[in-house]
Regions:
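An acidic, low-aromatic, low-complexity terminal/linker signal
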Residues: 1-152
Length: 152
């Protein structure tokens, strides 16, 4: 299985490559008024407005620095309405990693503050924690960025 890796602070994280639509350079976003914490704005992605989440803001409490290695990852998120696009700002998006999904093991501690942080892979280069894109958004963020289904 292929993963794209990134760093936040000194820690390494991984996203499943099959969920990634495209990796873009950091671009200017459309700002939104009074967003929940972590929501950076919206991206006009081929005519579709895609909400963007800043992982540095969510995990480290500060926005991602505007560096060459800071990228905007467009990913497919699965929810009760099917797949939707979500932009994810991540730091040090420079590598991929190939391993079996079964090589990831429980870290032994589950954070209620970060339910999107999943299992851990221990490799030659240290620990890599898997990020579950379907659990990235809190219910408040999800309600803010995705329109509810139309009433029948």
């Amino acid at each position: 299985m292929l993963f794209i890796t990134f760093r936040l602070g000194g820690e390494r994280y991984a996203l499943e490559a099959e969920r990634i639509v495209e990796v873009l350079p950091l671009v200017d976003l459309q700002t939104v008024l009074r967003p929940p914490p972590g929501i950076a704005g919206t991206l006009n992605y081929h005519g579709e407005f895609v909400p963007v989440l800043d992982l540095s803001q969510m995990i480290l409490g500060r926005p991602a620095p505007p560096r060459l290695s800071t990228r905007l990852i467009v990913a497919r998120v699965n929810d009760d309405q099917g797949f939707r696009l979500l932009g994810i700002i991540a730091e040090n998006v420079t590598e991929t990693m190939r391993c079996d999904a079964n090589d990831f093991v429980s870290p032994g501690i589950v954070s209620g503050e970060a339910p999107f942080l999943g299992t851990v892979h221990v490799g030659e280069r240290g620990l890599v924690q898997r990020v579950d894109v379907d659990r990235l958004l809190t219910s408040r963020q999800r309600d803010f960025v995705f329109e509810p289904p139309a009433a029948a």
